[in-house]
Amino acid sequence: MAVISMKQLLEAGVHFGHQTRRWNPKMAEYIFTERNGIYIIDLQKTVKKVDDAYFFIREIAMNGQDVLFVGTKKQAQDSIREEAERSGQFFVNNRWLGGMLTNFKTITKRINRLHQLNAMETDGTFEVLPKKEVSKLKKEMADLEKNLGGIKNMKKLPGAMFVVDPRKERNAILEAKRLGIPVVAIVDTNCDPDEVDFVIPGNDDAIRAVKLIAAKMADAVIEGRQGEQLAETPVETAEVAEEAQVAVEAAE
């Protein structure tokens, strides 16, 4: 039994890697073939890796720990926010601020400032202040919300981090590694898998591909918290082999 099917991966375009001239040799084991100058990712391995990541994230959630969803590239921003919110988790989808994890105490002070400004807006304080000052405070509040809104209720460091594109989010990964926080990530053919604890080989540039994988990680959290089996799909060996061939033919 697998939590994701080859058909789902194919339909979302998870198998399309980067151009062959833009690759990391460490990803060779996850590459099935090359077609028209583009690497095709081995989806049989992706199915297995999604399983591994899913059960790990589910275990984290069962233990009462949180998962931080991170994806600041345009293709990932909406999915990261939507799936984190759906599963009651935290997210960073605009910009990774240095020290978000390693200097969490200082970040918490900025979050407290955001809460303070929200309270001022709600309790009517803004109404009695000069318009110029209110305008300045609202801009400050908007900037804080944009960068910290996804973690404003995070009281402690997460138990794991789910990342889209380790190359772009390298600072986030380095902070997580420094603190011993396990990293699950969608890793495309141009990335270094050695920096990730749970590699999910796949296309990190297609919105549908990112949405599919992020949704599975959110499902894992929900299942871990609720004890519900949300998504199990039987995958037969023959079917996997057949669909892998379809992926190659589709790329031609």
From Swiss-Prot:
The GO terms describing molecular function are: structural constituent of ribosome
Keywords from the UniProt entry: Ribonucleoprotein, Ribosomal protein
Q: Does the record bear Lipid biosynthesis in its keywords?
A: no
User: What top-level branch of life does the organism fall under?
Assistant: Bacteria
Cross-referenced Pfam families, in alphabetical order? Answer: Ribosomal_S2
Q: Name one GO cellular component term.
A: cytosolic small ribosomal subunit
User: Its GO biological process terms?
Assistant: translation
Recorded hits in PANTHER family, A to Z, give: 30S RIBOSOMAL PROTEIN S2 PROKARYOTIC AND ORGANELLAR, SMALL RIBOSOMAL SUBUNIT PROTEIN US2M
Similarity-based family? Belongs to the universal ribosomal protein uS2 family.
Annotated NCBIfam families: rpsB_bact (TIGR01011)
Q: Which HAMAP family match?
A: Ribosomal_uS2_B
Official protein name in the record: Small ribosomal subunit protein uS2
Q: Which organism is it from?
A: Ruminiclostridium cellulolyticum (strain ATCC 35319 / DSM 5812 / JCM 6584 / H10)
Cite the source lineage: Bacteria, Bacillati, Bacillota, Clostridia, Eubacteriales
